[in-house]
Amino acid sequence: MKKDKAHLIAFIGVMTALMFTVLMLETYVFIFFIKPSPAFLTIPLFIALSMYGDWKHSFIGGTIFGCCSFILSFIVGYTVFYNPLISILPRTLAGVAGYWIFYGLTMLAGKEKVRQVLCAVSAGLTVLLHTVFVLGAMQVFSTGGAFFDTVWQVIIGVNFVAEFACAIVLTPILVKVIKKVTKTPDFLPLKKKGN
């Protein structure tokens, strides 16, 4: 039991460092072209982390992404994301929703052969939910302003398309990599015949 907890804590630490580094690189590559920058690598990573393990761990990927986004907002001045209800909460909810979408689709299909396709479909739906949750949180918890309007337009117009495409392609790959590195036998149980 202690070994499992130690493994989980170490895994979360490594993934947090990786997530923050990737998010920072994405931000500084695009900061001169578009604000807020698209998280085209970070979002597939957070979705893959949300599909790691069982439902109790499904909040990990989104929470790590939200915390990294919250910290980075102070570094680069994304004032809209200074509020944790905008930067952390929607990402945590999207991670949990992504797990349950993947779980539900896997239970419906019950076939190993289509798992990669289901993972890609789940990733696409999770990006859609993530965008809706973040924009909804911005609408409810933000004070508005010119930067708010720009952020709203950029997220819908540019970021969503890039993040959606990358999540569909990269999430199944990242899930396989995480599964192999952590020696997890499978992310979700397949539906057994006779159950």
Identify the function of each model-found stretch:
Residues 21-38, 63-99:
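Interfacial aromatic-anchored transmembrane helix boundaries in multi-pass membrane proteins
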Residues 1-16, 148-195:
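Alpha-helical transmembrane segments and their cytosolic interface
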Residues 26-30, 34, 72, 76, ...:
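Membrane-interfacial segments
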Residues 1-57:
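Hydrophobic transmembrane alpha-helices
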Residues 92, 96, 100, 124-136:
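Mid-bilayer segments of alpha-helical transmembrane spans in multi-pass integral membrane proteins
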Residues 105-132, 186-195:
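Internal alpha-helical transmembrane segments of multi-pass membrane proteins
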Residues 4-15, 39-43, 83, 87, ...:
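Residue-level signature of transmembrane alpha-helical entry/exit and packing/kink sites
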Residues 59-69, 119-126:
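Central hydrophobic cores of alpha-helical transmembrane segments
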